[in-house]
């Protein structure tokens, strides 16, 4: 099974990923964890360029770097893990590119989608959990943190476009992408995450 978590920066996504990993470990469920960009040696080098180096990247350059990282991790990590029937847990995957580079940066949605198909080789999560919060809430959370990468320092309008992109994706693919209210308590969100995970496991014919 392949499950991904999505959300705009400041949504609480990373907190929920951490809680879900703890849940899996408590229940002795083996899993492979990946994050985007990164997850491989090549991917981590690309992550450094994308998020922390002082390069002035054009949107097209940024998109292709994300795709390069994704192509590597799909073939090096995800496909081998799925072939071994392992659970794969991703902190961001292909939907991030559509939301951030497509809707956020204004690149062609069709082009981003085509590049996603090429970079993933058609590998798609069985379940994607989108932790949704209003942009003003997310920005307040980010401002409370001391460290910000280049993407987290984008404008309010940028994150509004990204959030709208995620919501559009969820409308188009409601069976895979589930929207979770990120303004609920951390505990309530985690409960819903686990509930949706177990339902998906059941649909796929797996048990805990």
Curated annotation (Swiss-Prot):
Entry keyword Glycosyltransferase: no
Keyword flag Zinc: no
EC number assigned by the record: 2.7.4.9
Molecular functions per Gene Ontology: ATP binding; dTMP kinase activity
Alphabetical GO biological process terms: dTDP biosynthetic process; dTTP biosynthetic process; dUDP biosynthetic process
One Pfam family from the record: Thymidylate_kin
Disulfide bond positions: none
Cited InterPro entries: P-loop_NTPase (IPR027417), Thymidylate_kin-like_dom (IPR039430), Thymidylate_kinase (IPR018094)
Highest taxon, organism lineage: Bacteria
GO cellular component: cytosol
Uppermost EC category: transferase
Reactions the enzyme catalyzes: dTMP + ATP = dTDP + ADP
HAMAP family listed in its UniProt record: Thymidylate_kinase
Stated role: Phosphorylation of dTMP to form dTDP in both de novo and salvage pathways of dTTP synthesis.
Family: Belongs to the thymidylate kinase family.
Name the record gives this protein: Thymidylate kinase
